[in-house]
Structures are given as structure tokens and as C-alpha cells.
Amino acid sequence: MNRNQEVIVGIDPGVSGAICILRNGKVTMTCDMPIMVDGTKSKRQVNAAELANILINEKIGEQDKIILESVSAMPGQGVTGMFSFGQSFGVIKGVCAALKLPLHLVRPVKWKKHFNLLNSEKDASRT
């Protein structure tokens, strides 16, 4: 693999999130956040081992940039929902730390402003 290329990994955290890899500005891979079911209540959570496998198989290394959306509590989400989201966020940070990947936290308003998506429908940011 040509290591002279710029590689950016964008991660939308949470069990409904996704991963996108750009190489020299071109999307080369997208996938849903890997999840697993935990316990008898069928609680979904981020699958740390599978996330690590994705990053390793895509040859993501210390020279690449990992951008993790840094989101905060949403009105009406509830304590259990926020705890679950925080757990997912922590799993992603832990996987990146274990793989020695440089992690950059970016607030939604910053990346949406960069792509002129402020005040747009949520679906506009998914395309």
C-alpha cells in the first residue's frame, strides 16, 4: 500500500453509527458500526474486536487521521440511552488507543459547517 497517501477515517459513534475511510479524498470503504448483542435483554453495543479488525484489515496506522464525532446528550434521550452511547464512545476511543491510532474529536457543528450542512436535514449529512 502506498503510504504517501492521506488517509482519513471518519467515525460516527454509537450502535447506529458508521465508519468511512477516505484515501486521497476518495471514499474507499464505508460500513455500519460493528455491533454485538450482549446479555439476555438483547442489548446492542459496539463490537470492539470487530472494529479493531476493520481498522487493521484496512491497514490504518499511526500516520493516518481518525476523526471521531464528539457528540453530547440529546434532549429526551434518558439516562440509560446516554450511558449506552457513552459506553460505545469509550469502546471506540479504547480501540483507537490500543492500536496507537491518532484520534481527533470533532463536534458535529464543526464538520457540518465545513461541508455547508448547518441548518440542513439530517439526511443531507448522510450522503
Language-model region placement:
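Phosphate- and other anionic-substrate recognition elements at nucleic-acid/protein interfaces
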Residues: 1-127
